[in-house]
């Protein structure tokens, strides 16, 4: 058991030889072993029912690759029987398998409780997909509903594909424009899947095949698509998250507490050959706009990956990577919204709590951004809820936004206006009090209060509690839970928390290890340099 009094202050480490330290060191070695020769953590995405179903549908209507259709069918039937997905993916899978389904209520029922600014678009998306699969009728909606100008690259392609499907399904093809077809062109270009996104490519192919001029290109592309199947016979949502996982792993290996901007005494910064190589690898993957994407080859930058990467580069080589850090800071400043918050992808889209907190954590160490940080903190304090729940978005657990906001609120240091410092302190205390109040009996947390505990959700909570210091008993119980959950190989298996399209979960198994290691590094300090 971890002695709770030893964890009562942020940055205080557990005694040497404790179970948590042994757990951390075994996990750190496992994470280090996952770093490839290119300096990146290998973080492939696992198969998912949605993409596998859409590919089966596409191959079926094209009469292509019967042996691949058999593999997809086995994968889907196995998932439906032994590991049923959510209602939306279940409906899509059964339709792709040729089963009769009653009406088109599945998407509406599953999305009814999804409280998010994208909910209307997601209802349109999945209703259209179910109509394409023959489950329901196509929605009668204006073409403007499919507009996604200024949004992330793959969303523009997805909405254009849905618009084309709807136009053909409702006999309104005269409403289509050259731009609609142009947005789908990357889906049939030779080479790796565009933007690493199988879902976007499949939607584009389903739409392109309706136009005889594009049928040949679609069939040629199918060979490349089927080559991307995983060994279990399914297709993933995206290729992987190597950049995202590497940035988090780098922070965990070097010691996030060492570079916290909250005024805590540094624990240790375990920089060495491996973290340096990881930082170099990330810096070379910077996009022309200064931002970073989730995996190599993706040109669409985002606040999430950019923020994590900036934090790591500051730890691993602030001078060596000063140019990359400065360019990334400029990217973040360019996407900031007038309300002081930060969106995920593009200025003008709604600001989000987790993304705003992430940007604060990336920018706060640079005094030149004090005003920007204060305005972002003001946004966060305005958005707090009385019960402490902040947001469930790209991460579907409540603990992700809580830990990131808790870290961000620590940025309201001596230089912040007094009112803002008080509000930030209240926000942090309220959020961690909420975490302690909904902790499961086994010491962990799930996606939502009452859900079974999982390592990723618990690790996020550990970060928040370790930086607050006000709930030592809850933190000790959480660390005990993570120690018990560690597998014989030193790693973790977890319910995934990443979502896309929101709110559908997708699994990148490597994230369980790197996220838990980050939590342990915050709670008990970074590990000694692992063997390389």
Swiss-Prot record:
Reaction equations catalysed: (2E,6E)-farnesyl diphosphate = (5S,9S,10S)-drim-7-en-11-yl diphosphate
Binding site for Mg(2+) 2: 158
PFTB repeat positions: 275-317, 325-367, 428-469, 475-518
Active site: residue positions: 304 (proton donor)
Cofactor(s) of this protein: Mg(2+); Ni(2+); Co(2+)
Record's cofactor remark: Requires a divalent metal cation for activity. Binds a binuclear Mg(2+) cluster coordinated with Glu-158 and the diphosphate moiety of FPP.
Top EC class for this record: isomerase
A molecular-function term among this protein's GO annotations: metal ion binding
Family: Belongs to the terpene cyclase/mutase family.
Function: Catalyzes the cyclization of farnesyl diphosphate (FPP) to drimenyl diphosphate.
Protein name per its UniProtKB record: Drimenyl diphosphate synthase
């Amino acid at each position: 058991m971890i002695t709770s009094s030893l964890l009562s202050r942020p940055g205080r480490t557990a005694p040497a030889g404790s179970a948590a330290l042994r757990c951390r060191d075994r996990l750190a070695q496992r994470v280090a072993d996952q770093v490839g020769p290119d300096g990146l953590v290998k973080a492939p995405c696992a198969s998912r029912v949605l993409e596998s179903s859409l590919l089966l549908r596409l191959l079926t209507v094209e009469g292509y690759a019967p042996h691949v259709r058999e593999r997809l069918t086995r994968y889907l039937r196995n998932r439906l029987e032994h590991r049923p997905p959510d209602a939306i993916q279940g409906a899509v899978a059964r339709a792709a398998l040729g089963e009769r389904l009653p009406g088109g209520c599945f998407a509406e029922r599953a999305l009814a409780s999804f409280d998010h600014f994208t909910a209307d678009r997601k209802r349109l998306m999945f209703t259209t997909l179910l109509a394409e699969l023959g489950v329901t009728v196509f929605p009668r909606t204006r073409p403007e509903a499919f507009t996604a100008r200024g949004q992330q690259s793959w969303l523009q392609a997805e909405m254009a594909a849905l618009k084309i499907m709807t136009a053909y399904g409702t006999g309104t093809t005269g409403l289509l424009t050259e731009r609609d077809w142009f947005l789908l062109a990357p889906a049939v270009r030779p080479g790796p899947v565009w933007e690493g996104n199988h879902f976007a490519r499949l939607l584009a192919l389903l739409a392109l095949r309706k136009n005889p001029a594009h049928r040949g290109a679609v069939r040629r592309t199918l060979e490349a698509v089927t080559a991307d199947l995983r060994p279990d016979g399914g297709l993933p949502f995206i290729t992987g998250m190597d950049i995202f996982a590497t940035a988090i792993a780098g922070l965990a290996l070097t010691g996030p507490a060492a570079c916290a901007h909250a005024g805590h005494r540094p624990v240790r910064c375990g920089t060495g050959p491996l973290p340096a190589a990881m930082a170099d690898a990330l810096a070379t993957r910077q996009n022309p706009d200064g931002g970073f994407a989730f995996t190599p080859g993706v040109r669409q930058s985002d606040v999430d990956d950019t923020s994590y990467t900036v934090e790591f580069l500051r730890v691993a080589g602030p001078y060596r990577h000063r140019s990359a850090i400065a360019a990334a800071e400029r990217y973040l400043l360019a996407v900031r919204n007038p309300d002081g918050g930060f969106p995920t992808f593009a200025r003008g889209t709604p600001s989000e709590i987790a993304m705003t907190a992430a940007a604060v954590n990336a920018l706060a160490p640079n005094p030149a951004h004090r005003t920007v940080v204060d305005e972002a903190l003001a946004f966060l304090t305005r958005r707090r809820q009385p019960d402490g729940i902040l947001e469930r978005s790209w991460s579907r657990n409540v603990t992700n936004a809580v830990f990131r906001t808790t870290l961000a609120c620590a940025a309201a240091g001596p230089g912040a206006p007094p009112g803002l410092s008080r509000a930030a302190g209240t926000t942090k205390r309220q959020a961690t009090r909420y975490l302690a109040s909904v902790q499961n009996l086994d010491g962990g947390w799930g996606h939502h209060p009452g859900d079974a505990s999982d390592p990723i959700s618990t690790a996020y909570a550990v970060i928040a509690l370790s930086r607050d210091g006000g709930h030592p008993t809850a933190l000790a119980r959480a660390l005990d839970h993570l120690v018990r959950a560690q597998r014989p190989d030193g790693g973790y298996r977890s319910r995934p928390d990443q979502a896309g399209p929101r709110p559908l979960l997708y699994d990148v198994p490597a994230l369980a290890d790197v996220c838990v290691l980050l939590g342990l590094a915050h709670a008990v300090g970074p590990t000694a340099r692992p063997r390389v």
